[in-house]
């Protein structure tokens, strides 16, 4: 739970460029996880949900920032 608070505070302090960079890295990791699963090499399937949730958190932060710039 404490890690989640640190992640949220880090997301709010990162620049937009850093957020997009992290988003691209997580998307690549998700692709690799899917590839490993298709080959039957994936051991830690819970990593899927963690990566997907991190992607959603970054997208949410980007949306918040874009909406705040409009007003």
From Swiss-Prot:
Q: Biological process GO terms, please?
A: translation
Task: Work out whether the entry's keyword set contains Ribosomal protein.
Answer: yes
Please give one Gene Ontology molecular function term for this protein. Answer: structural constituent of ribosome
Cellular component terms (Gene Ontology)? cytosolic large ribosomal subunit
Q: Cross-referenced Gene3D superfamilies, in alphabetical order? A: 1.10.287.310
What keywords is this UniProt entry annotated with? Answer: Ribonucleoprotein, Ribosomal protein
Top-rank lineage group of the source organism: Bacteria
What InterPro entries would the database entry show?
A: Ribosomal_protein_uL29, Ribosomal_uL29, Ribosomal_uL29_CS, Ribosomal_uL29_sf
Family annotation (PROSITE patterns):
RIBOSOMAL_L29 (PS00579)
Indicate whether Ribonucleoprotein appears among the record's keywords.
Answer: yes
Q: Which PANTHER family match?
A: 60S RIBOSOMAL PROTEIN L35/50S RIBOSOMAL PROTEIN L29 (PTHR10916), LARGE RIBOSOMAL SUBUNIT PROTEIN UL29C (PTHR10916:SF0)
- Annotated family: Belongs to the universal ribosomal protein uL29 family.
The record, for NCBIfam families, names: L29
Q: What is this protein called?
A: Large ribosomal subunit protein uL29
């Amino acid at each position: 739970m404490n890690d989640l608070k640190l992640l949220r505070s880090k997301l709010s302090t990162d620049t937009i460029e850093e957020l997009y960079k992290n988003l691209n890295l997580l998307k690549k990791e998700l692709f690799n996880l899917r590839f490993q699963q298709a080959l039957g090499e994936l051991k830690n399937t819970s990593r899927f949900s963690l990566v997907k949730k991190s992607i959603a958190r970054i997208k949410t932060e980007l949306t918040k920032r874009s909406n705040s710039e409009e007003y």
